[in-house]
Amino acid sequence: MSEPREFVLDTARGRIAALRLGNPKGPKVLALHGWLDNAASFIPMAPHLGEVDLVAIDMLGHGASTHIPAGYDYAFVDWLHDILDVLDALGWPQAHLLGHSLGGALATVVAAGAPERVLSLALIEALGPPPWPGEHAAERLRKAIAGRRKPASLPRLIPDIATAVRARLQATEKSEAAARLLVERNLKAVEDGYQWRSDPRLMWPSHMRAEEASVRNWLAAIDCPVLLVAADPAPVYFQPEIRNERFACLKHGEMHVIAGTHHVHMDKPAEVAALISAFWTSLAKVP
């Protein structure tokens, strides 16, 4: 595989940075990373995915993409339109969506809401948005409102890359190599050190989310084939019970559970890529 090629896409809400990681003449695959990650999330897997045209983006507020304007926040529904804008900017009427965590949740809802744009879903550690306990809705709403009324804090100064890598390792279980890939794309050099490029507003809690009944209705409406790769042990918000109940809502689903961390696609790229490649190959054989 050739070296990743950097480019940018202009969309309605801002400029989105992207990496082209495959063969531009191959099947079109749009890769969507997880919360506080970036396009580098898919670099380890890319050489194992075969001759696909893999484009991995930094979602707005992440990596090298622009931040949304002051006075706004990162609502889930707005990211859906960002993804459709990216497909338009690429000139792709349809594409296969590959998503990890938040990216997988977004891909799921795009497939439900704009089925004509999505050929298939390959999801890693996600099947719709995280579960939403409705009995805590008022408490979460108050926290979200209070959080937005607070004055913005000053950006944190990070003395060196090693310190940033340690911080990422403490925040989410993953290998050091995976953490370094994500960190290096999400740092900007400043006087006396580094700062995160990601928008601090990504840490704001959501005002509201979809109820579980809505998520399952979306899943049941997905027409395209779906591959789910889940890690064992499962994260708290994606336990086997709810994962399996959601999976049962799909019309055309395939699931594999493998030992690994939440970033299993970075820690075991060849193993996860083999499952995804086999899934895509099976689709090509369908008459």
Task: Report residues per predicted region.
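Alpha/beta-hydrolase fold catalytic core
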Residues: 1-29, 50-53, 92-93, 128, ...
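Conserved alpha/beta-hydrolase catalytic His-Asp/Glu region
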Residues: 153-210
